[in-house]
């Protein structure tokens, strides 16, 4: 996934997660699912950054 697109997806998922937390609470099933999806996106982003840094050296 292109870095800029990934950042947009992360921001979109964060906003969605915030709305779900406010509506359903921190421990609801949907909140946990969305949080895990956000975690996955963040891990993808970190891997891309690490590859970019390693490639620059």
Curated annotation (Swiss-Prot):
Entry-linked InterPro entries: HLH_DNA-bd_sf, Spo0E-like, Spo0E-like_phosphatase, Spo0E-like_sf
Q: What is its EC number?
A: 3.1.3.-
Protein origin, superkingdom = Bacteria
UniProt gene name: ynzD
Similarity comment: Belongs to the spo0E family.
The opening ranks of the lineage are: Bacteria, Bacillati, Bacillota, Bacilli, Bacillales
What is the protein's known function? Aspartyl-phosphate phosphatase which specifically dephosphorylates the sporulation transcription factor Spo0A-P and negatively regulates the sporulation initiation pathway in order to control the proper timing of sporulation.
SUPFAM superfamilies the record matches = BAS1536-like
The biological process GO terms on file are: regulation of sporulation; sporulation resulting in formation of a cellular spore
List the induction conditions. Answer: During exponential phase and in conditions antithetical to sporulation.
Q: What is this protein called?
A: Aspartyl-phosphate phosphatase YnzD
Q: Please tell me whether the keyword Zinc-finger is annotated for this protein.
A: no
- GO terms assigned for molecular function: hydrolase activity; protein dimerization activity
- EC class: hydrolase
Keywords (A to Z) from UniProt: Hydrolase, Sporulation
Q: Does the keyword Hydrolase apply?
A: yes
